């Protein structure tokens, strides 16, 4: 990765023919590739060494010059420069075209840029380019105007002449007829014969008239066409055009093909066109105005940049370097070649044939056909299949063109620039390593040796085990004994990165210190499985090796697993004891009545352990034990005279004493049963109180204790543990009677089918719940299944209910709940019919999961793309704005409680304004951090809501500021400058995506209030894409009174505004559930019926702030309904990006165009500038964009092109001559620079390291420490390998 900060911009533009020739090292004239006998490139062909460079390093084509000493010489015999062969990856050639061709991206893209510029419909443009119509490129209006009377007179003369000729011909026919009639009369002919003669004469006359009229009409048509001829007119009638050219060729010019487009562009006045369009926009309406706006964008793009519209027509085509379109020999002597070579060959063949035809002076029709074929060949080279049928190769496969090389997952952007593969990596199956510490992983010896090979070889040479690197390599390959000792030494404190695919969030890659293990499997610490979502059923993981000292320091400080205990999405611990460990700790901390040793008192823990060993005291029996270093817990009643720090006699169990020994010494005594919930709260509390190293140590202790006691808990499962409740038959009987009654009412026609279904579902749901409760009551506390589920180690009550109680209601393939339940449990066994209906749900579940994974992955990708440039750029933007969030809720019974979502709304933020109690005493200043303690304090003081900073109100010009973001949830500290909070937000929202359901829940086919409520993942996508939901619920546009109009045909809600304006009527479906009644008063933006609201309507009626709130609340509603906790700030980051743009309505005196989408910051800047100069500011409307659209609308063309619609983005960017400011992450990854986030920021890189006094003293006293150290260039990267990574927290880098 280069860290060249001089590269500040990346510009794209239209290449002119001269630029293409400037890039080129020579013209490719022949379609040949390589000689079939010598296998060497053909001269002037597509692989020519003279143009592209030698195929062998330092060797010319003919072999006259070999070796590096001739570097730079151009061989006089073969013309090849003696240089490295790798120049064949860089040097371009070109094809000089015999006729210009248009660039298909600008003509065929949507919208057609050429069409907009020339004001031609794409259909007409196509006719011109592909030689189906002539285009008038210039008209000499003045000359035509001057000569019009003469030309009119000439036409009139010609018409008169035609009329005279017609009349003369008719008279001649009439004379002949008279003569013939007279002759027939003389001969005594019959009347029939005369009639025949007359008819024949009439026919002749009619033909003469018709022919003459046709000629006169044609003449008039030619004249009218010429008289009204203007530039840009098309003429598809070849004969008519020829006639015009013959008669009036000196007054106009016209042509076909790309040449006519080129001529037109050469004379095109951009400034005049822009002025005319602005005029149209100011005065026009409707369709005309819209089209003028769109055209102005294109015209303006050429006016305001150095781009020339002529760049859209090509006179030369660049030929990319041969190594990028290689030709390789296969085993059978055949060749595999890149499709581009075929496409280039077609272009060269057609171009050469066209040159030959032009030299021969071939007829125009043949030349035009060849030009059309050349145009098509260049089209298919640039974008095969964009127009007409694609060019296919063998097996009818469409060939991959230059556009296809960039597009899609396999394209250049996503495959090579954003998805590079790395060396120093390996992968293997994972197995559990319960003996490891949290920061360790077990690395198989062979794998470690391969990964650390260069380090081992260097060390072998340093220790004189080998004379040189070559012999060291041989030693490593032969697994000599010394190698293993050196390997042990080399891997000490050199972290490795472990990664498990799919990497859904940043905890999917973590650093560990490797421990060498036998076998071929990587050993993974059991507590990090949650973060990786790993299990040991055959999962594989990849290992990567950070090489440079900087990379190692980053891995150790930022990525070490013991520093990543908290989840970035909600700040909860993710390294939690699970399964076996929970069972062990639960077993350890439960209390049992009547066990051995109950009520005894012991003088010390040691004595109690001894009693346990001898069988006198059971682990779970209540007893009194004298404890040293006892830290009391809340609610412990201290005996009289007891002082903190003194020993205390505590009533507890030996198990709980052992459990507390795993916790830090100064942690309050824990007298609770250690189930999953309690352990989570415990680790959460530890993370709040102690540094991460201490928490990691405690977690390891808990893990060891958990495994140890799990193996002694005797948890097994037997069929006898699955006890069906004896009350089940009686319960079922009662509910069956109710169901029969409902069925009877239906049979009699008292209720309809929907009511029957809903009643039955209700009845059987109650029955299921009652059986489940009976089953739970029936289970003994010692029952192992009960212990497993109660402790949270495995399974849930629903699963137990299905095994031991009742299977209950299931869904059919449509997703509707069937009103017939499965009455058996798995323990009792299902009947055939029950088994059959149960299979539907199971199959749908599996299909669902597969779909969900793909959809969730795509959602994450779009979220990352839209938010990747949201980086913390400054410590405080000094804004006074913020959000008001509730601290407390009032329950249904009227009791005030702490808001249940406070952890994911207020926690971890910064106060925007000071908080005072009722007496006006300030409890917290603005800028205070909302920690758990602070929230408790404010709640206790009776504060019900607080104003906090939020990224939604942040005023940083680029990225966001640390104060508006608040705490980084992963570290529990205020977020660092440089933190990529956008990507963290995207990962936090995308990672639980797979847990969300795909279905739209059906309430058993019952017509619910608003059809089927879209839930789960589809709802999240609908919100983030800002789509109008299906069956949208209306919201009131004004404040007023409700009047409900219920007619036979429809149901309408009418709002009568308070201010007496026109009424608003909202037609609603009959089955919709109304939220308002007749006569109610509604406020602006109040929802009128249940259902999903259109966020665009919320924005229009209630404004951006309410739209943001609505989106955040709706997204959180979906996640909370699934029991997934995500902090609001992550959703806010995404919503901020969706509402970042403004559509310009009035441009005022600014440079902004009406209808243009601009960034809020740019809009405000332009307006400030205009107001400062006393000009009119622009007016704009905030725009809510879906995440896909917002990603494509980013200022960075590199980022947008690598996301979706690559060709469209590049076409637009090149036309506008866009510059990419390289502020986001993707752009910098693409061009190979360090990302401007985290440790890639300049402030962390421009640091001078100076040795301290101690280090200097060490240098003089112990030369060995700095044996390899020099201030020479090669060691500028950092100190030698003996030095450990230094925690970056100890340094003050200035600025925060």
Curated annotation (Swiss-Prot):
It holds the Pfam family RNA_pol_Rpb1_1. Keywords: DNA-directed RNA polymerase, Magnesium, Metal-binding, Nucleotidyltransferase, Transcription, Transferase, Zinc. Its EC number is 2.7.7.6. The lineage of its organism: Bacteria, Bacillati, Actinomycetota, Actinomycetes, Micrococcales. DNA-dependent RNA polymerase catalyzes the transcription of DNA into RNA using the four ribonucleoside triphosphates as substrates. Residues 185-204 are annotated as: Disordered. The RNAP catalytic core consists of 2 alpha, 1 beta, 1 beta' and 1 omega subunit. When a sigma factor is associated with the core the holoenzyme is formed, which can initiate transcription. GO terms for cellular component: DNA-directed RNA polymerase complex. Residues 185-202 have a biased composition (Basic and acidic residues). PANTHER family: DNA-DIRECTED RNA POLYMERASE, DNA-DIRECTED RNA POLYMERASE SUBUNIT BETA. Mg(2+) binds at residues 535, 537, 539. InterPro entries: DNA-dir_RpoC_beta_prime, DNA-dir_RpoC_beta_prime_bact, RNA_pol_asu, RNA_pol_N, RNA_pol_Rpb1_1, RNA_pol_Rpb1_3, RNA_pol_Rpb1_3_sf, RNA_pol_Rpb1_4. It comes from Kocuria rhizophila (strain ATCC 9341 / DSM 348 / NBRC 103217 / DC2201). Zn(2+) 2 binds at residues 877, 954, 961, 964. It catalyses: RNA(n) + a ribonucleoside 5'-triphosphate = RNA(n+1) + diphosphate. It is an enzyme of class 2 (transferase). Zn(2+) 1 binds at residues 60, 62, 75, 78. Its cofactor is Mg(2+); Zn(2+). Binds 1 Mg(2+) ion per subunit. This is DNA-directed RNA polymerase subunit beta'. GO terms for molecular function: DNA binding; DNA-directed RNA polymerase activity; magnesium ion binding; zinc ion binding. Belongs to the RNA polymerase beta' chain family. GO terms for biological process: DNA-templated transcription.
């Amino acid at each position: 990765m280069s860290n060249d900060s001089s590269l500040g911009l990346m510009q794209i533009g239209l290449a002119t023919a001269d630029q293409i020739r400037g890039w080129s090292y020579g013209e490719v004239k022949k379609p040949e590739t390589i000689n079939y006998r010598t296998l060497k490139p053909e001269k002037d062909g597509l692989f020519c060494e003279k143009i592209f460079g030698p195929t062998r390093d330092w060797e010319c084509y003919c072999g006259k010059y070999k070796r590096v000493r001739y570097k730079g010489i151009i061989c006089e015999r073969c013309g090849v420069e003696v240089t490295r062969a790798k120049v064949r990856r860089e040097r371009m050639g070109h094809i000089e075209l015999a006729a210009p061709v248009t660039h298909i991206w600008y003509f065929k893209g949507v919208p057609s840029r050429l069409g907009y510029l020339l004001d031609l419909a794409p259909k007409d443009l196509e006719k011109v380019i592909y030689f189906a119509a002539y285009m008038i490129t210039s008209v000499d209006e003045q000359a035509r105007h001057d000569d019009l009377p003469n030309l009119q007179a000439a036409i009139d003369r010609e018409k008169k002449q035609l009329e005279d000729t017609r009349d003369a011909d008719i008279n001649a026919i009439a004379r002949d007829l008279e003569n013939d009639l007279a002759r027939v009369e003389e001969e005594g002919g019959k009347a029939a014969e005369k009639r025949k003669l007359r008819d024949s004469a009439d026919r002749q006359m009619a033909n003469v008239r018709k022919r003459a009229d046709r000629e006169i009409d044609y003449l008039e048509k030619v004249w009218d066409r010429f008289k009204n001829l203007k530039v840009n007119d098309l003429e598809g009638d070849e004969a008519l055009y020829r006639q015009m050219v013959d008669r009036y060729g000196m007054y106009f010019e016209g042509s076909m093909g790309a040449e006519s487009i080129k001529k037109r562009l050469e004379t095109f006045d951009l400034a005049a066109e822009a002025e005319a369009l602005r005029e149209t926009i100011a005065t026009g309406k409707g369709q005309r105005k819209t089209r003028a706006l769109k055209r102005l964008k294109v015209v303006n793009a050429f006016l305001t940049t150095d781009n020339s519209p002529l760049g859209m027509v090509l006179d030369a085509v660049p030929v990319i370097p041969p190594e990028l379109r290689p030709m390789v020999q296969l085993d059978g002597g055949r060749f595999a070649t890149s499709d581009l070579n075929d496409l280039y060959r077609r272009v060269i063949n057609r171009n050469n044939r066209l040159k030959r035809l032009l030299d021969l002076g071939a007829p125009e029709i043949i030349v035009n056909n060849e030009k059309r074929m050349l145009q098509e060949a260049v089209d298919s080279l640039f974008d095969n299949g964009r127009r007409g049928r694609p060019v296919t190769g063998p097996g009818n496969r469409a060939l991959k063109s230059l556009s296809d090389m960039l597009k899609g997952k396999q394209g250049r952007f996503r495959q090579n620039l954003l998805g590079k593969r790395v060396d120093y990596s390996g992968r293997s199956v994972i197995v559990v390593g319960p003996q490891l510490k949290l920061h360790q992983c077990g690395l198989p010896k062979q794998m470690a040796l391969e990964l650390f090979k260069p380090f081992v070889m260097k060390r072998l040479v340093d220790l004189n085990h080998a004379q040189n690197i070559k012999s060291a390599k041989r030693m490593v390959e032969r697994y000599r004994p010394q190698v293993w000792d050196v390997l042990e030494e080399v891997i000490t404190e050199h972290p490795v990165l472990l990664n498990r695919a799919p990497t859904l969030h940043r905890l999917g890659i973590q650093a560990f210190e490797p421990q060498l293990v036998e076998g071929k499997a990587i050993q993974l610490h059991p507590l990090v499985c949650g973060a990786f979502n790993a299990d040991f059923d055959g999962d594989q993981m990849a290992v990567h090796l950070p090489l440079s000292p900087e990379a190692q320091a980053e891995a150790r400080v930022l990525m070490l697993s013991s520093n990543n205990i908290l989840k970035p999405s909600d700040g909860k611990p993710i390294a939690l004891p699970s399964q076996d460990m929970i069972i062990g700790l639960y077993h350890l901390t439960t209390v049992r009545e009547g066990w051995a040793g109950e009520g005894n008192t012991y003088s010390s823990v040691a004595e109690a352990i001894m009693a346990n060993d001898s069988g006198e005291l059971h682990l779970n029996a209540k007893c009194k034990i004298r404890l040293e270093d006892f830290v009391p817990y809340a609610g412990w009643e201290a005996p009289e005279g007891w002082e903190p720090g003194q020993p205390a006699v505590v009533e507890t169990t030996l198990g709980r004493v052992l459990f507390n020994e795993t916790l830090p010494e100064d942690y309050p005594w824990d007298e609770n049963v250690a189930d999953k919930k309690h352990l989570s709260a415990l680790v959460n509390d530890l993370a709040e109180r102690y540094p991460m190293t201490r928490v990691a140590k405690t977690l390891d202790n808990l893990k060891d204790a958990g495994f140890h006691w799990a193996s002694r808990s005797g948890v097994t499962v037997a069929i006898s543990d699955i006890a069906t409740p004896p009350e089940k038959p009686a319960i079922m009987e009662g509910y069956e009677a109710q169901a029969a009654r409902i069925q009877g009412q239906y049979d009699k026609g008292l209720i309809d089918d929907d009511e029957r279904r809903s009643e039955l579902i209700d009845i059987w749901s109650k029955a299921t719940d009652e059986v489940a409760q009976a089953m739970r009551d029936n289970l003994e506390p010692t029952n192992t299944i009960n212990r497993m589920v109660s402790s949270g180690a495995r399974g849930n009550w629903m699963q137990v209910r299905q095994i031991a109680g009742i299977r209950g209601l299931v869904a059919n393939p449509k997703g509707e709940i069937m009103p017939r339940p499965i009455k058996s449990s798995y323990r009792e066994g299902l009947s055939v019919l029950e088994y059959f209906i149960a299979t539907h749900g199971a199959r749908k579940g599996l299909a669902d999961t597969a779909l969900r994974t793909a959809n969730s992955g795509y959602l994450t990708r779009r979220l990352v793309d839209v938010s990747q440039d949201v980086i913390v750029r400054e410590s405080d933007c000094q804004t006074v704005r913020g959000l008001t969030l509730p601290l407390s809720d009032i329950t249904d019974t009227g009791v005030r409680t702490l808001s249940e979502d406070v952890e994911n709304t207020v926690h971890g933020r910064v106060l925007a304004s000071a908080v005072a109690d009722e007496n006006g005493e300030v409890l917290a200043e603005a800028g205070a951090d909302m920690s758990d303690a602070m929230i408790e304090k404010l709640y206790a003081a009776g504060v019900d809501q607080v104003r906090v900073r939020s990224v939604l109100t942040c005023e940083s010009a680029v990225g966001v500021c640390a104060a508006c973001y608040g705490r980084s949830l992963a570290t529990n500290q205020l977020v660092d400058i440089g933190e990529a909070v956008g990507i963290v937000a995207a990962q936090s929202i995308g990672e639980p995506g797979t847990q969300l359901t795909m279905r739209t829940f059906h309430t058993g086919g019952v017509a619910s209030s608003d059809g089927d409520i879209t839930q789960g993942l589809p709802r999240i996508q609908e919100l983030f894409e800002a789509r109008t939901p299906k069956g949208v619920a209306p919201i009131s546009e004004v404040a007023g009174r409700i009047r409900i109009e219920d007619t036979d045909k429809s149901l309408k809600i009418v709002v009568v505004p308070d201010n007496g304006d026109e009424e608003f009527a909202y037609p609603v479906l009959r089955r919709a559930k109304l939220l308002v009644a007749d006569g109610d008063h509604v406020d602006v933006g109040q929802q009128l019926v249940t259902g999903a609201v259109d966020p665009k309507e919320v924005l229009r009626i209630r404004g951006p702030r309410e739209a943001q709130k609505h989106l955040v609340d709706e997204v959180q509603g979906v996640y909370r309904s699934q029991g997934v906790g995500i902090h609001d700030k992550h959703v806010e980051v995404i919503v901020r990006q969706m509402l970042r743009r403004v559509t310009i309505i009035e441009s005022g005196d600014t440079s902004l165009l009406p209808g243009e989408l601009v960034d809020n910051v740019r809009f405000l800047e332009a307006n400030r500038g205009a107001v400062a100069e006393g000009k009119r500011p622009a007016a704009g409307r905030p725009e809510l964009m879906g995440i896909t659209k917002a990603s494509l609308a980013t200022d960075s063309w590199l980022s947008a092109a690598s996301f979706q619609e690559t060709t469209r983005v590049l076409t637009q960017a090149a036309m506008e001559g866009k510059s990419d400011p390289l502020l986001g992450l993707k752009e910098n990854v693409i061009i190979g620079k360090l990302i401007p986030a985290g440790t890639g920021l300049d402030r962390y890189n421009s640091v001078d390291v100076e040795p301290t006094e101690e280090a200097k003293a060490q240098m003089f006293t112990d030369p060995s420490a700095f044996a390899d150290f020099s201030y020479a260039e090669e060691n500028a990267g950092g100190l030698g390998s003996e030095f450990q990574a230094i925690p970056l927290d100890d340094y003050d880098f200035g600025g925060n």
